[in-house]
């Protein structure tokens, strides 16, 4: 998606503070308080890219998404809908990552489905990656066209 939009890709996991990473490695789910600084860092990173960026992050709760929306006007979200079982399978295939499969259930318990919120596109997260990326990029491009001022012809 980032490549299709010619935008930088930002991986949200790279911005977790060491204390959060340690908690997750130990199988301890993050609290809202644990995420405050992380969300602020993500907002800062997005603000450093005024032309746009693609951010990959969980943004599980509406409050987290609203925090990012308030910091970055015009922010849009692509929600990849998958089942807990599919998520567990994918996490298990990431050996060496600090996020253990044991935390998948807690993420789904915390998840507030963003479908229906303004500025959210919900896609089937089990569809082929190239199709998901293309659909998301098409949506963003259409939004950009809809919000860009169009030149008017001179008489």
What does each model-identified segment do?
Residues 9, 14, 77-79, 120-122:
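Conserved beta-strand scaffold positions in the cores of enzyme catalytic domains, especially
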Residues 140-155:
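C-terminal accessory "lid"/substrate-recognition subdomains
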Residues 65-70, 89-93, 134:
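Short amphipathic alpha-helical segments
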Residues 71-91, 123:
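Conserved phosphate-donor/acceptor-positioning beta-strand/loop module used by diverse small-molecule
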Residues 2-44:
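Conserved substrate/cofactor phosphate-moiety recognition/catalytic segment
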Residues 49-53, 76:
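Loop/turn-to-beta-strand initiation segments
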Residues 93-137:
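Small-molecule kinase domains that catalyze NTP-dependent phosphoryl transfer to phosphate-bearing small molecules
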Residues 16, 60-61, 82-87, 128:
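Conserved nucleotide-binding/hydrolysis micro-motifs of P-loop NTPases
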